[in-house]
Amino acid sequence: MVSSILRDARRIVIKVGSSLVTNEGRGLDETAITEWSRQMAALVNGSGGPRREVIMVSSGAIAEGMKRLGWSARPSEIHELQAAAAVGQMGLAQMYETKLREQGLGSAQVLLTHADLADRERYLNARSTLLTLLRLGVVPVINENDTVVTDEIKFGDNDTLGALVANLVEADALVILTDQKGLYTADPRRDPHAQFVHEAAAGDPSLEAMAGGVGTSIGRGGMITKIIAARRAAGSGASTVIAWGREPDVLLRLTQGEAIGTLLVAQTAKKQARKQWMADHLQLRGAVTVDVGAAAKLRQEGKSLLPIGMVAVEGEFSRGDVIAVRDAAGAEIARGLANYASAEARLLCRRPSSEFERLLGYSAEPEMVHRDNLVLSGG
């Protein structure tokens, strides 16, 4: 199945861990980053296949900071970790920028925390920014903003962040590159009977029992965090591959359909997963009523909702809240994430996007609800 899932994937989140990026803490591994950059460029440019959108989630800031500060052991004091992250992020971003630029690609540094993705407005802002970067052909390089968080450094990991980014942009696949070849039924270093797991369902509860253990002194994630990340990614319909990051041409071979590493398959299609997520996790905050033309475009063509088609706004809501879209008879057509708060939406009713700046003092998205953030009701 890996052949079809990765071969058909058009939007891919790639996560690399500290032990790979830093060669077990001995500074950034320039050779490895050069190789990943070359492969990412081939994917983005469509060399030998379709063009793909790629997001890199990269650890390594703390490890690089430790090297620059002359520390051989990872400190336990939280503010020293934050200082190391601040120092190391400079080198990490510069390395990716240099290597991607050598391949003719632009890059963008994006620092996120779990809180950014838990807040609806910041979630929507982050999503819009990342999708714009992808549209421009830029490779976002994402890391956790370790300098301003605490729990994420102590207990978190970039495997989880990679999964959350896959959720955020509705990626087709998450590729976790690690220093292991994939998942085994037991630790192969201790159990000679351990068998390699080529494929499993991402939600299989037996996987966590197989993946016990902890991370290295450089990074914090072990195989268990990758299993949990795969389950999270599957929540938005993304399947996950866990593979050895130093496998030659690993990204190119995966996207050509070669079976490398462990494939953890999402059991729910992307559109259905998105609908279920909105139904289960987001509370309805308000509603807008639309005219006949807008209702038809939503129902029949799955178009975005433009303010010019809105005739009324109900309730008080903020940007990023879930609102219902109703026709003139009050029947619910769809639900989606609002790009504008209720007060702004009332000003924009029946107005073309060319008037937004005059009415609001700024001009952002032309849509009230973008089609990517909209789910039709009733199936």
Curated annotation (Swiss-Prot):
GO MF entries: ATP binding; glutamate 5-kinase activity; RNA binding
Superkingdom to which the source organism belongs: Bacteria
Entry annotated with the keyword Magnesium: no
Compartment list: Cytoplasm
CDD domains for the chain: AAK_G5K_ProB, PUA_G5K
A single BP term in Gene Ontology: L-proline biosynthetic process
The entry's keywords: Amino-acid biosynthesis, ATP-binding, Cytoplasm, Kinase, Nucleotide-binding, Proline biosynthesis, Transferase
An example Gene Ontology CC term for this record: cytosol
Catalytic activity: L-glutamate + ATP = L-glutamyl 5-phosphate + ADP
Residue sites binding ATP per the record: K15, T178, D179
Enzyme class: transferase
EC number: 2.7.2.11
Main location: cytoplasm
Similarity section: Belongs to the glutamate 5-kinase family.
Protein name: Glutamate 5-kinase
Species: Paracidovorax citrulli (strain AAC00-1)
Organism taxonomic ancestry: Bacteria, Pseudomonadati, Pseudomonadota, Betaproteobacteria, Burkholderiales
Gene this chain is encoded by: proB
